[in-house]
Design a protein with these regions (language model features):
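Membrane-proximal helix-turn-helix segments that form the acceptor-binding/catalytic region
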Residues: 119-156, 163-165
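Aromatic "clamp/platform" in nucleotide-sugar-dependent glycosyltransferases that forms part
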Residues: 288
Length: 387
């Protein structure tokens, strides 16, 4: 039995890549051979440093992703697209029994329609280099059609009811909610009982314009004026093309004269992230409309009180008193979070157990078994593994 995992690149090391890694582990542990189709060769050391686990032994083959390919690779029993929010990957023989699409949020068709420059560049990296404008337009149309067919002709999984409603509205497809995997046990065990916390504020996000990190810098200006918090640490991974956006954020900090309040750390190691989590009392998420919010769950499991915008999937698990719509409300929510008792932190931490990697793997394996029948005997014979 062979399963083909499809993902643009695992080297971005964000929440979507964590899900792809857990999915690879879930399928491999069932005794099914796993092949990876991707545009960029995985940097196994970077992946290990980011997630504390290796997938090298789980992959039987790594092939170059070809979104023009019309049919599945020979002998492939099931295709799992773990990048279904961005990647229009469709084969003519796809159906709901041999194709699974994990769609964090159905954004690709919108990005194609509006001609988003970043997404257009991503499509060009896939197949458009050297094409004439007329051929590029034909390919954009083909990509749009492929995305729609992929969503309609596969079993679609998503991360929250917020995303489920968006998928139903856009494609008429009723997807199944499978929350993404989060290393809640690692963060809880390493950080929950920390006695070294101060009034510092933590932000975890990939440095990319789509993440709207400038929102937390605008909030930081008001927090500093109101003498709330000792510092704000903004940390996350950054690819080479993120330098321009990072410079913009740096200039914004200087414009607000927040150099002594806002600090950036890029591509930090996992142990450094744990150090910051042990010190922080409040986590702020910058993006309204976040489909789920893996970093929010990580922070909660570590005993950090989350403060999030009041639109998005994170509203399904963050208490209303820690949600905000305006920056003024954000200041009030941060003040409430800073004053939260230890019992509140423990309660929120333990509420995240349902999002554990173990639960994700178990539920994904059950879905795979139910729709394909390829793993029943293997699943019964092998225990659920942990990353």
């Amino acid at each position: 039995m062979i399963a083909n995992i499809v993902h643009i690149s695992l080297n971005a090391r964000g929440g979507g890549e964590r899900l792809a890694v857990a999915t690879i582990k879930a399928i491999s542990s069932m005794g099914i051979d796993v092949e990876l189709s991707t545009l960029e060769k995985p940097d196994m050391q970077l992946i290990h440093d980011a997630y504390g686990t290796s997938i090298e032994a789980d992959l039987k083959k790594i092939r170059t992703l070809n979104i023009f390919q019309k049919y599945r690779p020979r002998n492939c029993n099931v295709t799992v697209n773990t990048h279904g929010d961005m990647l229009p990957f469709y084969h003519n023989d796809f159906n709901k029994k041999n194709a699974i699409t994990y769609c964090h949020y159905p954004i690709a068709s919108h990005l194609i329609d509006c001609g988003d420059p970043d997404y257009s560049a991503a499509l060009q990296n896939m197949c458009l280099l050297g094409m004439t404008p007329s051929l590029q337009n034909r390919y954009y149309n083909a990509a749009r059609t492929a995305y729609i067919k992929m969503m309609v002709n596969s079993t679609v999984l998503t991360n929250s009811n917020f995303s489920r409603k968006a998928i139903l509205k856009s494609f008429g497809v009723d997807s199944a909610v499978l929350p993404p995997p989060v290393d809640v046990d690692i963060f809880r065990n390493a950080c929950l009982t920390s006695n070294s916390r101060d009034d510092s504020i933590l932000v975890i996000s990939r440095f990319h314009p789509s993440k709207k990190i400038e929102n937390v810098i605008h909030l930081a200006k008001l927090l500093h004026q109101n003498e709330l918090g000792t510092e704000m640490n903004i940390v996350g991974n950054m690819l080479p093309d993120g330098v321009g956006y990072f410079n913009y954020l740096n200039n914004l900090v200087k414009h607000y004269e927040l150099e002594n309040f806002v600090r950036f750390e890029i591509n930090l190691r996992f142990d450094r992230l744990l150090d910051l989590m042990r010190r922080s009392k409040v986590y702020v998420h910058p993006l309204p409309g976040e489909p789920f919010g893996i970093s929010t769950v990580e922070a909660m499991s570590a005993g950090i009180i989350p403060v999030v915008p009041d639109i998005g999937g994170h509203t399904e698990f963050v208490p209303a008193k820690y949600q905000f719509h305006t920056y003024g409300q954000g200041v009030e929510a941060v003040a409430t979070a800073l004053a939260a008792p230890a019992s509140e932190k423990a309660k929120l931490s333990h509420s995240t157990q349902k999002y554990s990697v173990t639960n994700y793997i178990k539920k994904f394996q059950q879905i795979l078994t139910d729709i394909t029948d390829i793993g029943k005997k293997r699943m019964e014979a092998k225990p659920v593994i942990r990353l």
